[in-house]
Amino acid sequence: MSDSSTLCQIAERHGVDLQQVQPLDLEGRIEQLRSCLLRTDVPYPVSADRARDYLDCARRGTAFSVGSLSAEQLDLGQYQAEQFYDRYSLEEHLSWACLIADQQRTKSRYACQAYLDGEAMFAIGGMTIPDFYLLNARIYQQTGWQLATVSMIIPAELFFTCHSRRFFPVTTFMRKLEQDYLQEPDIGHDVAGHVATFTIPVVAQVMQNHGIARNLIYQRRDEMLDATSEQQQRQSILNKADELLLYAERIYWFTVEFGLVMQQAELRAFGAGILSSPGETRYSIDSVKPTRLRIDPSRDCDLLRLATTDYLISEYQKTYFVTEHFDLLQSLTPERIVATAKIAARLPHFSWRDVAPGDTLVNLGESSISTNEKYFRLMCNQPADECVTRTAIRNLRILSSGPGNTVDLAGHWRAPLAPVPESVVDWFRREDQQGKFAQQTIRPLSFD
């Protein structure tokens, strides 16, 4: 544990009064929860019976695990965790307070107004880590969603099963002091990033629709598995389902997690992955490094652009997609998400640096490349990041697979892609037949 002098210095750097970082005791938290549960002027009032049982659990000091204010139930199995609120240290509460202070400075400038309104509704901007009993009650009353605590990053199948039932998985650990970007989510990401988006009705519906879409993919996968006992066929079915899940996940990533929206002719962020990181919040709007592309998700070609574009999980994004207004997201029904994923499986893909013909540019990023440049880099053995290389191999393997497997690209994009020279395709075919490009060409699901 850091000494008090160090903690005071850290707090001062972030504009936080360390004396205000004082969590309420159990009695104070219970009084807040009791007042909350009594409210009837909300979209989803809590029944008297459920409110009584919920309050009793909190009063006994039972650790919070899965919200119990609706009839929906959820089994997290080995991934279930609990929030033992009184075990958080002063350092952890200070880390929250510093993150919130930093976020508030950037969110007020860069977040869309609908997000800011939602954050104010849930009173997230406090000086201490939220008690999930109270936060869950507030979220449920306003949106019908609830929290479910998890111990680690959970499998994609479970993550989106939660979504389909209007549960959102949240971790219980808090990042270290002054740590900005995380590869795995903490309370700062899950709560200070995602929770406000539940109050944007169309975004909350898109999240649930992704859960339902994945259920459709799982259902079809399981039906096909039941119809065969041949091991190779079963593995092929599993691989195909995972591939479809990845393409659906990309749509989720570029909207719910890292989406930008226009607000009074200015760029604003609504993606939780952006807004949970003060550094990426500024970067996503102001930096000249990433490419920003305007899309209309109600158009099939633009939704395919999302599904066929790779993304980064270890650093700030190289490409962001900008939606004109939230209403355009209403078209992301479960059936349309699945149909788009199936088409994406047959098409060439884009790396996170690619700018394609027909893309509507907000700005061109410093590290952007044309769609064909990755093929020439591969052919000439020029430096390229793993995504550029992986995407080039995948696309060339499709294009070189023979006349019987020729890909029909007509009508899938806003404008035709530049044709890949036959000399490049012929070169790749020879090299691939000799086993030069054996590496994986589909990145694993990031929610695993």
Predicted regions: what is each one?
Residues G273-L347:
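A recognition module on extended beta-rich or small alphabeta surfaces enriched in W/G with H and D/E
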Residues D242, Y247-G259, S276-P278, V407, ...:
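Extended, compositionally biased low-complexity polar/Lys-Gly-rich tracts
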Residues M1-L216, K318-D448:
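The feature captures two recurrent sequence modes
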Residues V195, T199-N239, L260:
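Non-heme Fe(II) oxygenase catalytic core, chiefly the N-lobe of the double-stranded beta-helix
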Residues H163, E230, R234, P278-R282:
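Short amphipathic alpha-helical patches
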Residues W145-T149, L216-Q219, E223, E257-A265, ...:
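Intrinsically disordered or highly flexible coil/loop and linker segments, enriched in small
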Residues N136, E223-A272:
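Extended, Lys/Arg-enriched charged tracts that mediate electrostatic binding to polyanionic substrates
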Residues C162, Y218-L225, R282-S287, E335-R336:
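Surface-exposed beta-strand edges and their flanking turn/coil or helix-capping segments
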